[in-house]
């Protein structure tokens, strides 16, 4: 029986981006559905004992940079360790992803979410700028005016708030988190365990 993955992301997270292609590949390989939730980690971190990057100790920030470089080199993904527009505003891009998820389906929503992450971490672009976001949407073979108009509906911001609380209720505390049933896998470095779980069916 095909499995379903609930995929909790931050559209600013380098770790989400480092795992982006692999989670798509694993879902395709094992015939799993992949549903993306761009939740608000500004709400999740304080509610779960975490800290946003600027509030972490210098030691933790330095180690994060070292780990990003290790994973960049190991995976061959050319991320910029100090992107110009990090963190970018996630509000509009999240509304676009949620609106597409609910109206056009999971695959296109995942595609746009991953396109936004690539813009931040490889291309030094600012998806918080509506003009830039529109160009990114166009590269996904979508009409940017139509998507941005759809995303302007406040129901998508409300849905993000609901999704964020649901993530907390399920035990999510970091990005990316992959949930298969009630089992949570936190971090792109756990994707090997995700694949094993998918292989079991």
Where are these regions (language model features)?
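A structural signal for the main folded, soluble domain(s) of proteins
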Residues: 1-4, 84
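C-terminal cap of thioredoxin/glutaredoxin-like
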Residues: 3-6, 12-32, 111, 115-201
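Structural alpha/beta surface segment adjacent to cysteine/selenocysteine redox centers
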Residues: 11, 17-120
């Amino acid at each position: 029986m095909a499995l379903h993955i609930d995929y909790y992301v931050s559209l600013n997270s380098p770790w989400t981006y480092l795992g982006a292609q692999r989670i798509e590949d694993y879902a395709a390989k094992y015939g799993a559905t992949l549903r993306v939730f761009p939740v608000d980690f500004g709400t999740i971190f304080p509610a779960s004992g975490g800290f946003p990057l600027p509030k972490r100790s210098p030691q933790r920030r330095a180690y994060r940079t070292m780990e990003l470089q290790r994973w960049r080199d190991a995976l061959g993904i050319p991320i910029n360790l100090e992107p110009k527009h990090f963190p970018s505003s996630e509000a509009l891009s999240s509304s676009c992803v949620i609106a597409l998820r609910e109206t056009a389906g999971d695959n296109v929503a995942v595609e746009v979410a991953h396109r936004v992450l690539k813009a931040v971490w490889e291309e030094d672009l600012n998806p918080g700028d509506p003009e830039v976001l529109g160009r990114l949407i166009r590269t996904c073979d979508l009409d940017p005016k139509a998507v941005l108009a759809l995303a302007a509906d406040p129901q998508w911001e409300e849905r993000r708030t609901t999704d964020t609380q649901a993530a907390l209720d399920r035990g999510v505390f970091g990005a990316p988190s992959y949930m298969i049933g009630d089992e949570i896998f936190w971090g792109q470095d756990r994707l090997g365990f995700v694949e094993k779980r998918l292989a079991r069916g």
